[in-house]
Amino acid sequence: MSSPVPGLMLPEKRVVEVRNLSVYFEQQGQRTDAVRNLTFSVDRGETLAIVGESGSGKSVTSLALMRLVEHAGGVIHQGDMLFRRRDGQVLDLRGARQRVMRTLRGADLAMIFQEPMTSLNPVFPVGEQIAESIRLHQRMDRRAARAETLRMLDLVRIPEARNVLDRYPHQLSGGMRQRVMIAMALSCKPSLLIADEPTTALDVTIQAQILQLIRVLQREMDMAVIFITHDMGVVAEVAERVLVMHRGESVEAASVGQIFAAPQHPYTQGLLAAVPALGSMRGQPFPAKFPLLDQNTARIVDNVPQDTVPAHAEPILQVSNLVTRFPIRSGLLNRVTRQVHAVEKVSFDLWPGETLSLVGESGCGKSTTGRALLQLVESQKGDITFDGQRIHQLKGAALQHLRRDIQLIFQDPYASLDPRLTVGFSIMEPLLVHNVCRRQEAEKRVAWLLSRVGLEPEHARRYPHEFSGGQRQRVCIARALALNPKVVIADEAVSALDVSIQAQIINLMLELQREFGIAFLFISHDMAVVERISHRVAVMYMGQIVEIGPRQDVFERPQHPYTRKLMSAVPVADPSRRQREQVLLVDEIPSPIRAIGDEPTTAPLVQVGKRHFVAHHPIAGAY
């Protein structure tokens, strides 16, 4: 073990103090400064939020504190990182040996990573993984460590914790896996918890649970917390102080109240302007672009909302009683014994120039609905009509022709672009496959499409890895628009992007809708973004639509309890409206898996207003 280093002093309540930290990465002789001259501190019981967009250096800062940045090729070449252990001794993390760091990590210093599935070992039960940390740092035997593991799972409000002990990570939902990560991080009562984007990929209701859980446990353990995020709504919900990072440097640091009430730096002002605030569209019947601030000049760029749905138009897409189920085989004869009831009797219409948003939590069936429209998954029942033609049983050339008119934008642009092809060829490929034009004309159209989505024509020669996340999503939008589609299905198209990039992509989609009359089926779990972009909204739960209507009615007068639950879980980017603590919701969405012949109960939608329909029946877990 290490001993206190003479001369290192911290104020009594101070847990960590970072002074002039600089980190760089070197690759092929080129040096990239990831963090430059960063200074901050965190006291016991305090939460510091470090915010900024991708590439700002916030995650590198956390890895430097854990001394894990060296394993990723980083070099800490300047600065001090003073840290107070639980026993009161102070040491400089920068100068600590790896042997000492191994005793600190998981004990005095703990970290929750963004993606729990990649942080948990898939071949060990989650209980064994938590118990291993407890045995290592607290010198407990197996029986005592298992009992302490059970106590920690109870502490993080996992229902039926005893049954969860022996489950593997893949058998748990995203919210449950993140709670397991929190239990593991807190199992040895650390002085400092670093939470690196712990809720970014989670649904709003699960996110609300995780944020409240961290606050409750912080109070119980009097722990310092560094919360790393790009979501300003989350910052307003959890932080006492905020550090804003941009290109590896601190551009502003102040109390959470000061940052939100009177941000000084143009970059901070731009971040806040790009935050989709729930309720900001109150009284407005049509979608509206984000009033973006130029982050260099702080000048606002706004527009006037206008209707893009032609009067007296017929629906371009009609879906009636769509049912999609996936078989589960088991037993010696590999027979179908159960089914995943992904979509149950879903019906809706979509008009030209309209955006209909499908919202709900993971597993509600919204993505399956979008894929079923293009026959990317097989539906068992239902009727789909596109532009007056029934399409749900099209095959061969007829189906290929349909896919010219209905295009799909996926959530992960990197996974949906071939890394071996230039982005120019990826955009051109649909034009060549469908024999729309010759190669020379296709190259001209690619240049025009890239310009239209805010990229340069010369970018056509680059590969996907040479672009940022937001730029890659623009490439995917350009590819989707190459064939002049009438309908675009956007499946979580902006959920993984930084707030300002997200706002730019939403604005681009609204511009293209206004220019070309495209109808969007926008699939999302982000209620604040949905409020901004939608004409109408359909709320899905357990494969069923439980509420559908004009966006203004659904958001300002939600009728179904599940819709209200989704709304109340959205973090508000205003610390003065910080949600008072509610009873922690631990209900998981019931399983959609049923035995053969066990039909789910569905209820017809009842009209409660003009084009506003609600399912009037109690659904377990929705209330």
Curated annotation (Swiss-Prot):
InterPro entries: AAA+_ATPase, ABC_transp_ATP-bind, ABC_transporter-like_ATP-bd, ABC_transporter-like_CS, Oligopep_ABC_C, P-loop_NTPase. Gene3D superfamilies: P-loop containing nucleotide triphosphate hydrolases. GO terms for biological process: peptide transport; transmembrane transport. It catalyses: glutathione(out) + ATP + H2O = glutathione(in) + ADP + phosphate + H(+). This is Glutathione import ATP-binding protein GsiA. It is an enzyme of class 7 (translocase). The gene is gsiA. GO terms for molecular function: ATP binding; ATP hydrolysis activity. Residues 18-272, 317-567 form the ABC transporter domain. It is a peripheral membrane protein.
